[in-house]
């Protein structure tokens, strides 16, 4: 447990939103966040380790080792039911709506959300017709006149797997980027991570900021606070529902 606490301190130092969130959420939410980061919530695996259960089985998928990471990010049943997608899309809605509201001039903004798509996708057909894996980034920012396009892809990952997710998402859109470059566009692939405990690293924030500046879009730091807060609240909801067999995704969460 000491190692978990040390990791929490390191993450807090590197996270641009953690301390801001701490001042703006109820005490019970911050308590949940601290226990989440130190692996001291009552997951099936922890209950087994604490001697309160004989087995640490996941109530949803029957995995024999239902760790906290499994419950909040890895359970296949929870994934297929849309629990993790609800968190992802809630975070995505916040950044997409903010960026779209600030876009000016020739800048267009599309996102893989119903009210932000163009003909069911995120890249206009007159720019490029592309289907299949790696054809629909989460967020697309486009300036036709300057021939610049940014492909942003969100992951709400565990702290320890953020780098792996970043590399995987970067590779996912390589072919799409090449097709767009063949059309004369300057392409920026921007994977970014809002971690499930609500952390956003300075590196991630800087990457988003630098991308938005290409389109003369400037966001306030409250955007990152809101992204972290939404991720944390969604993770809290996912955790508290892990013993509920059925899931109907509620409306996307707002800060």
Where are these regions (language model features)?
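Non-catalytic C-terminal interaction segments of nucleic acid-processing enzymes
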Residues: 1, 83, 114-140, 145-146, ...
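Helix/loop segments that flank and initiate small ligand/metal-binding modules
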Residues: 1-65, 90
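Glycine- and acidic
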Residues: 18, 76-80, 153-159
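Amphipathic alpha-helical interaction motifs in eukaryotic regulatory proteins
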Residues: 34, 38, 76, 92, ...
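A short acidic/basic microdomain associated with nuclease active sites
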Residues: 37-50, 99-132
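Short, flexible/disordered secondary-structure transition segments
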Residues: 44, 68-72, 102-109, 180-188
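Short Cys/His-based metal-binding microdomains
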Residues: 49-99, 149
């Amino acid at each position: 447990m000491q190692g978990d606490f040390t990791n929490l301190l390191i993450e807090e130092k590197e996270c641009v939103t953690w301390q801001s969130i701490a001042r703006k959420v109820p005490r019970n939410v911050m308590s949940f966040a601290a226990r989440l980061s130190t692996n001291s919530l009552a997951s099936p695996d922890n209950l087994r380790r604490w001697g309160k259960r004989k087995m640490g089985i996941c109530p949803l998928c029957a995995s024999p080792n239902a760790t906290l990471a499994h419950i909040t990010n890895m359970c296949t049943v929870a994934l297929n039911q849309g629990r993790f997608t609800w968190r992802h899309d809630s975070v995505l809605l916040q950044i997409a709506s903010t960026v779209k509201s600030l876009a000016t001039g020739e800048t267009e903004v599309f996102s893989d959300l119903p009210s932000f798509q163009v003909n069911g996708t995120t890249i206009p057909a007159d720019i490029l017709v592309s289907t299949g894996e790696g054809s629909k980034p989460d967020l697309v920012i486009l300036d036709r006149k300057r021939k610049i396009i940014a492909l942003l892809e969100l992951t709400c990952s565990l702290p320890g797997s953020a780098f792996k997710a970043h590399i995987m998402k970067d590779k996912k859109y390589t072919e799409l980027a090449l097709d767009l470059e063949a059309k004369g566009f300057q392409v920026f692939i921007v994977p970014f991570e809002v971690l499930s405990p609500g952390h956003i690293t300075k590196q991630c924030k800087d990457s988003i900021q630098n991308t938005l500046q290409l389109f003369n879009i400037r966001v306030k730091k409250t955007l990152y606070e809101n992204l972290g807060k939404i991720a944390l609240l969604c993770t809290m909801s996912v955790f508290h529902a892990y013993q509920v067999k059925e899931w109907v995704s509620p409306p996307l969460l707002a800060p």
